[in-house]
Amino acid sequence: MKYLLPTAAAGLLLLAAQPAMAANTGGYATTDGGEVSGAVKKTARSMKEIVDIIEAAQVDSKGKKVKGGAYPLIITYSGNEDSLIKAAEKNICGQWSKDARGVQIKEFTKGTYYPGHQWLIRQLRCLDCETLLTLWYVICALAICQAARKHGDAIRIDNSPNVWIDHNEIFAKNFECKGTPDNDTTFESAVDIKKGSTNVTVSVSVKEVGTLVNLSRLFFPFRIQRYRAFRLPVSCLP
């Protein structure tokens, strides 16, 4: 299913921390705030710059890859990509054949933190991450971000333990696009958790839709020891 997001922006907070039970939240990491020890501060004006900053943090000064990342990151986003959204709105089904656009965090466990600034993320994928706490306000648009050709999910967690997905706001409208797989670009879900992911917390997340799409898609065998209910508007209920 292709879906369109009206032009909008939202702040994102993404923090990776050591696993510790949080008494106040019931999650797998604390939300006491503060900066991770040794964190490097960066500023990004585009999604590509965010991707480049994360890639650079995975190698040392000699260019050698460091397991788990070379240092924690604090990334402040100061850009705005609303113009790309407006352009894509004119040709929704034409976005599917393009390369996916999104932020992927792969084998990075040092910690990443995005202060809440005006920004829009198209798609987030966490692959082989550990002890990752995601706490954010985010709006996703899969059709516009050209994500569905590879995997049609707004947020996808693969083979990653101790993950907390919190305070997500995902807007979606369904579009049938003839000539794509199943005529709906094989969109699966807003949140896809699979491939050995364990100890996953999903909480206080809202999905606004024009017509019903899957809220979450869970692949077994894996353990979700804490799966807290999404807060859904009435319009989303079947």
From Swiss-Prot:
Could you say which residues form the signal peptide? 1-22
Q: Which InterPro entries match?
A: Pec_lyase (IPR002022), Pectin_lyas_fold (IPR012334), Pectin_lyase_fold/virulence (IPR011050)
Comment on bound cofactor: Binds 1 Ca(2+) ion per subunit.
Q: Which domain of life is it from?
A: Bacteria
- BP term (GO), one: pectin catabolic process
Q: Which reaction does it catalyse?
A: Eliminative cleavage of (1->4)-alpha-D-galacturonan to give oligosaccharides with 4-deoxy-alpha-D-galact-4-enuronosyl groups at their non-reducing ends
Name the pathway.
Glycan metabolism; pectin degradation; 2-dehydro-3-deoxy-D-gluconate from pectin: step 2/5
Q: What does the UniProt function comment say about this protein? A: Involved in maceration and soft-rotting of plant tissue.
Name by which UniProt lists this protein = Putative pectate lyase X
Record organism: Pectobacterium carotovorum (Erwinia carotovora)
